[in-house]
């Protein structure tokens, strides 16, 4: 969505909160948070819109607002309007919606724009797309001469229509290339600042950074990207160590040993989505009888 934190209607937000909170003291406290304003260059600006992005409570209030403005409406639309299967996934103000039928996708998109407009929200024009995606997308697009299925980005990953080694359809998740470049750029700048620290201290910091990166990105089908990321980190570390001394004694053999001592190796840490879902929904059969899915992406 486009600038949802800044456009939230505060009157609607209070009404949503009053639906579940009966204690007027809590409501008044939240109203004070909303009216606290934002300080920029010494000037306090108070607005009757938005939740003040950056505030501790802003993400919570925005999530409550979107729950009533979008989530409940989407569930009701699926129950009453959809002619096929519909999948809705939202994280903060980013969401994707999957449809069995293209006609449902187009109707949902048009009606969702009207729904959001009622609550002072709108879709981001550059990030909102309607694409053909799923197990039959490649075959159908090839028949129409349209090339490979489009990809989409969600929560730091690029989702791709792929195949297993056995030739079966598989949704592949890869770390977004631009996000990885940005992370490596941050590491490079920080290593420059830490150039003259002892090697163990540098290694400890890099260990935490790489471990944290793997904790999020170590999903199935993303293993190669993890190896590439680790290789780039090793190279950045080697370049840093070479710059701090005129006598270049940092060979790749020694660098490899340092990396093995300090940097975690790439390992897939997260289960397949279908396996995770089956734990909480044991009677669910992944992809059972489901045709291809088209996605409306935000």
Language-model-detected regions and their locations in the chain:
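Non-catalytic terminal/accessory segments
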Residues: 1-298
């Amino acid at each position: 969505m486009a600038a949802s934190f800044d456009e939230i209607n505060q009157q609607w937000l209070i009404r949503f909160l009053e639906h579940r909170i009966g204690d007027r003291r809590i409501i008044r406290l939240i109203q004070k948070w909303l009216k606290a304003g934002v300080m920029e260059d010494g000037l306090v600006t108070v607005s009757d819109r938005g939740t003040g992005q950056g505030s501790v409570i802003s993400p919570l209030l925005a999530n409550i607002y979107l729950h009533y403005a979008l989530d409940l409406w989407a569930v009701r639309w699926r129950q009453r309007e959809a002619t096929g299967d519909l999948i809705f996934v939202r994280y903060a103000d980013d969401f994707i919606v999957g449809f069995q039928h293209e006609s449902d996708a187009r109707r949902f998109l048009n009606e969702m724009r009207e729904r959001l407009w009622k609550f002072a929200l709108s879709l981001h024009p550059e990030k909102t797309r309607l694409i053909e995606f799923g197990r039959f997308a490649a075959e159908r697009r090839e028949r129409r001469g349209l090339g490979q299925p489009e990809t989409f980005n969600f929560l730091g990953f690029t989702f791709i229509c792929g195949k297993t080694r056995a030739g079966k359809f598989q949704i592949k998740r890869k770390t977004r290339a631009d996000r990885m470049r940005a992370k490596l750029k941050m590491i490079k700048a920080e290593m420059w600042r830490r150039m003259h620290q002892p090697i163990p201290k540098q290694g400890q910091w890099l260990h935490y950074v790489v471990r944290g990166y793997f904790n999020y990105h170590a999903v199935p089908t993303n293993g190669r990207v993890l190896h590439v990321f680790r290789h780039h980190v090793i190279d950045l570390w080697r370049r840093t160590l070479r710059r701090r001394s005129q006598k270049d004694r940092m060979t790749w053999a020694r660098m490899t040993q340092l990396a093995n001592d300090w940097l975690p190796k790439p390992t897939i840490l997260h289960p397949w989505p279908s396996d995770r879902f089956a734990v909480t929904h044991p009677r669910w059969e992944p992809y059972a009888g489901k045709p291809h899915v088209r996605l409306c992406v935000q």
